[in-house]
């Protein structure tokens, strides 16, 4: 097995980056592709009371255990199996169990700050930024956090105004300059997704 092709997909919250990642993932046989979600690598917070966990800024680079993420990506590049963490968004903490991820021809790394850390960037063969209007992103975030993460409307809006938007402007938006490809309109841009799939297939044939 050759060195895997690592693809980084980033963008603001609700930009459609997960949709783009899934669209690309679904174009390949499951035996040759794996998904690494940056959200799985939030730091372990077992020693912090739940009330304090609720107040933390989860859109700041310090919220992520990039040391573990980088170690896992390097292991996959070296064709080693990893144990990917599972994060519980309602408990704001990692679960005890993990998911075994085996090396594959293609590794997708998806998350809001994938391009922010230069150590992660240098491991990536293709860097994608999904660019979507802010009003679309906040509506998607609102629906997701209420329906999937047990949040209230007020808490989501307050978090967006005080944390999510400032962090987007400070860390996520500036990382766009590191992207090889910028995809507008998120996962609905079928032409861009098809072009990416063709590019990945070309890299695999080298």
Swiss-Prot record:
It holds the Pfam family PRK. GO terms for biological process: CTP salvage; UMP salvage. Keywords: ATP-binding, Cytoplasm, Kinase, Nucleotide-binding, Transferase. Pathway: Pyrimidine metabolism; CTP biosynthesis via salvage pathway; CTP from cytidine: step 1/3; Pyrimidine metabolism; UMP biosynthesis via salvage pathway; UMP from uridine: step 1/1. It catalyses: uridine + ATP = UMP + ADP + H(+); cytidine + ATP = CMP + ADP + H(+). Its EC number is 2.7.1.48. One of its GO terms (molecular function) is uridine kinase activity. Signal peptide: none annotated. ATP binds at residues 11-18. Transmembrane segments: none annotated. It is found in: Cytoplasm. One of its GO terms (cellular component) is cytoplasm. It comes from the Bacteria. Its main location: cytoplasm. InterPro entries: P-loop_NTPase (IPR027417), PRK/URK (IPR006083), Uridine_kinase (IPR026008), Uridine_kinase-like (IPR000764). HAMAP family: Uridine_kinase (MF_00551). Belongs to the uridine kinase family. NCBIfam families: PRK05480.1, udk. This is Uridine kinase.
């Amino acid at each position: 097995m050759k060195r895997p092709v690592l693809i980084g997909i980033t963008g603001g919250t609700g930009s459609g980056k997960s949709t783009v990642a899934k669209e690309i993932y679904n174009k390949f046989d499951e035996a040759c592709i794996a998904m690494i979600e940056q959200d799985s690598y939030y730091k372990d917070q077992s020693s912090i009371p739940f009330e304090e966990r609720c107040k933390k800024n989860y859109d700041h680079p310090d919220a992520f255990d990039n040391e573990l993420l980088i170690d896992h990506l390097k292991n996959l590049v070296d064709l080693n199996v990893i144990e990917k963490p599972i994060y519980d968004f309602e408990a704001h903490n990692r679960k005890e169990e993990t998911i075994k991820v085996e090396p594959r021809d293609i590794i997708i790394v998806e998350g809001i700050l994938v391009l922010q850390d230069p150590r992660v960037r240098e491991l990536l063969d293709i860097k994608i930024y999904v660019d979507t209007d802010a009003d679309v992103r906040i509506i998607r975030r609102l629906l997701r956090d209420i329906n999937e993460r047990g949040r209230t409307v007020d808490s989501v809006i307050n978090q967006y105004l005080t944390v999510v938007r400032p962090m987007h402007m400070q860390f996520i938006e500036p990382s766009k300059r590191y992207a090889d490809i910028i995809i507008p309109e998120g996962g609905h841009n079928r032409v861009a997704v098809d072009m990416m799939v063709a590019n990945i297939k070309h890299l695999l044939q080298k």
